[in-house]
Amino acid sequence: TAMKNKTWKFALICSLIVMGFTACDDDDEYYYVGGGSSWLSYGNLEKIDNGSRSKFAIRRDDGNRLIVTEGMPINFDGAKEDLRVYVNYSIVGSERDETGLEGNMNYYIRLYGFDDVLTKVPVKQSFINEDEEVRQDSIGNDPINVREAWFGGRYLNVEFRIPVKDGSKEKHFINLVQDDVVAHNDTVYVTLRHNAYSEKPDTGNDRGNYSWGRGRVSFDLTSIVPEGQTSVPVKLLWTEYGKNTSETVNREDSGTYTLKNTGETGENKGLNQDKSKMVATEEVSECVIE
């Protein structure tokens, strides 16, 4: 189907850039930048018709809405309803959102910058098994280091790192595979997969010519919740590099994924748990979505 084919066509192209984050608050989705004067958030574009200088507002994963009144307008050609974005902004005002019943807020913001975020749906293991030799190789088995993983809105958000050859434009493919073949009681098992193709630090004579590349992806998990249910336990699996790129380590984390707007919160543990974090200034490659 078109949806299945689309899963294989997303690519990440890495280019070198220096990123520095100073500190963050207690919510996994929102980071403070520049001494607490601005924020970094995930959200989706939402059409707005209120005389705003932007054609779109941003609906954060917590349901609150960001309305641009200063700074960069969101009027670029690729802007569309529900486009997922990662935004840098400061809040200049707020009021209660009277358009809904959820008690959300409207935050009026000065927008400094934004990127669109790679969004995908899980690939089912049964689909891979239909042509296992080709699809298993295409989806990849290369390590991927998970920096952060959490549920936000209808998504599993993952911020990750991968080794990138200095100056390379090699494409990397990222997917999430749902195990629908082996039963795991009530828990849904998903595995983060990475295909680095020829860009592997332990091959050839280029072992030392690599830097860490940073990327982000959001997986829409609504399809993994069984019919008639509003939430499901989830176990996330991945393989990452150890202390050096010649070692690999199997990792896992778990939590409860709850459908949006059901009124349920699920049990706050693992991937659902808010936790205080410090993000230090580091020199890494930023993986840009194509």
Protein language model regions, located:
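Bacterial Sec-dependent N-terminal signal peptides
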Residues: 3-8, 14-48
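Short aromatic-glycine-enriched beta-strand elements
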Residues: 46-58
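Beta-strand/loop nucleic-acid-binding surfaces
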Residues: 62-78
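Flexible glycine-rich surface loops and low-complexity tracts that mediate binding to linear polymers
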Residues: 77-103
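Short, solvent-exposed, Trp/other aromatic-anchored flexible loops in extracytoplasmic proteins
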Residues: 78-80, 197-243
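Surface-exposed beta-loop interaction hotspot
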Residues: 95-161
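Short helix-loop boundary/capping segments
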Residues: 139, 143-208
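Short beta-strand elements
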Residues: 243-290
